[in-house]
Amino acid sequence: MCTTETPSLQQLTKLTILPSRSSQLSTPLTFLDKIDHIEINDTSERNGVVFYRIAVFLKHNTSHIPTIKSTAVSDQPDYQIERRFTDFANLRYNVWMYAQRQHDDGRRCKYCGEFMSYIVHSLSQPRALIKLATGVHTRKKLLTSFCNAFIIKALARKEHFRSLCTGYQTIPHIMEDFFRQVE
């Protein structure tokens, strides 16, 4: 009989791995990804200026384990912020500034192209015509659609190829600054 000894295996130990470098994009994307939706249901007027109260509803499902629990969104917003119509127009303009820039290869990436298509073709945006030709109630609806569409477009980057254009890297920061609650 031939007996061969097998070498004893070393006991495996737990190893904690922490990221040594994180993407500058991860913070704004994580923030935007937590937003379920926004609503603009109320306004206030101060010194003749209308402020739109943005109700921000966050996603609360933190577990990745499938359950039969309902992940329904609360009736109450997680926080509210106030913005003027010009703040919405500035958001649109700042996103446009980065999305319309010439890319290295001379063509627009898919990410920036989605924003440009929306900015050029959608009627639900903060434009001068909307401000002058509509009432506050209609503007609330249009601005709600605008904000929710921009959040969806900012997060659509997960589905696109890895782009290194300035719009791809900057637009999420612009969006985060607009929707972040000032403390």
Predicted feature locations:
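Intrinsically disordered, low-complexity regulatory regions
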Residues: M1-E183
